[in-house]
Amino acid sequence: MGQVLPLVTRQGDRIAIVSGLRTPFARQATAFHGIPAVDLGKMVVGELLARSEIPAEVIEQLVFGQVVQMPEAPNIAREIVLGTGMNVHTDAYSVSRACATSFQAVANVAESLMAGTIRAGIAGGADSSSVLPIGVSKKLARVLVDVNKARTMSQRLKLFSRLRLCDLMPVPPAVAEYSTGLRMGDTAEQMAKTYGITREQQDALAHRSHQRAAQAWSDGKLKEEVMTAFIPPYKQPLVEDNNIRGNSSLADYAKLRPAFDRKHGTVTAANSTPLTDGAAAVILMTESRAKELGLVPLGYLRSYAFTAIDVWQDMLLGPAWSTPLALERAGLTMSELTLIDMHEAFAAQTLANIQLLGSERFAREVLGRAHATGEVDDSKFNVLGGSIAYGHPFAATGARMITQTLHELRRRGGGFGLVTACAAGGLGAAMVLEAE
């Protein structure tokens, strides 16, 4: 076991997570169509503060993230402060770590708490796949800049004459990695082939995810942590996630064609997480500050780790890299965990990470460790379903996982939970949570 790194303040306080909340998650272009991420963020933070009954002035910092950036609101965190009635002097800044963005936001607030610069803060993220920054071609962009500097009408007309019809076409946001040109689904296909993960295994995991998420809603387990969203024209509120298949059937999964490798692929729309809109946030405090305010924390942040790997091969193996580091820093082993929640970007990616966490060879030859991180116990894994069912508003998923895991730990009488995710750019994140 390597060095244990306790997350405590200089006074010995643990980092408490006192509350967490999210909007329902909605598939792209459905319930939240036309609602920008900043409005989703304001919605969830405003409701989180109202439910917690914590005075707004108690919150000294807000760190928030958004992956699909909107040029008109580059600092979503500050817009949330200004749009929710929070103290105007509240420090606020934005972060981005792709699919691990709200993990990063939580880590940043935790570091401020440990440094002693704040005693309470909010971390979270919001994304909209329905309100997108549609761009213009590089040629048109250059001409528009030059036109702005032109002094006469003839100069402007001459510049516009250089354009062709194709230059006027809108440019949608890129879905491929900037550095490689590969889509995440391409990497998921590569990992499925490399690690021998079959179509049947992927479909079975997706089916399991939907079944468990549907059961979680049916049992009322998510009611406390998901707000009701009222959206224009205010005729029908959104109460639950709208991606979950309550009648999920394995036979239906088998009918779908591959989405990326059309001839030989196994990754489909059904065994991948869909584009989603939503927001999530958590309130963090020092343990002593929570006691002063008479608050009972949901749990505590025990450790965290971020890793980075090559983007050309196995780019989505972030959990297999970051998990052993987070466990090491927490002073725990895989067998001591009560719950494991892994982000399901793709069923193939999830199954590959599970396989390698239990691989002695991967531990020795790739991680340089003496032993495997540990086998993933199915009875502890994604017990309420995962991102394939709930959906994945990129910057919000981490905060969803943290809140969901802490509530489930408390229902089980406490223990330790691992939350972990892969992210674009070969990034990985893992956090160990503790509940009493």
Curated annotation (Swiss-Prot):
Keywords: Acyltransferase, Cytoplasm, Fatty acid metabolism, Lipid degradation, Lipid metabolism, Transferase
Cellular localisation: Cytoplasm
UniProt main location, coarse: cytoplasm
Catalysis: reaction(s): an acyl-CoA + acetyl-CoA = a 3-oxoacyl-CoA + CoA
Enzyme type, top EC level: transferase
PROSITE patterns: THIOLASE_1 (PS00098), THIOLASE_2 (PS00737), THIOLASE_3 (PS00099)
Subunit structure: Heterotetramer of two alpha chains (FadJ) and two beta chains (FadI).
PANTHER family reported in the protein's UniProt record: ACETYL-COA ACETYLTRANSFERASE, CYTOSOLIC, ACETYL-COA C-ACYLTRANSFERASE
Family: Belongs to the thiolase-like superfamily. Thiolase family.
Protein name in UniProt: 3-ketoacyl-CoA thiolase
Source species of the chain: Shigella sonnei (strain Ss046)
The organism's taxonomic lineage, starting at the top: Bacteria, Pseudomonadati, Pseudomonadota, Gammaproteobacteria, Enterobacterales
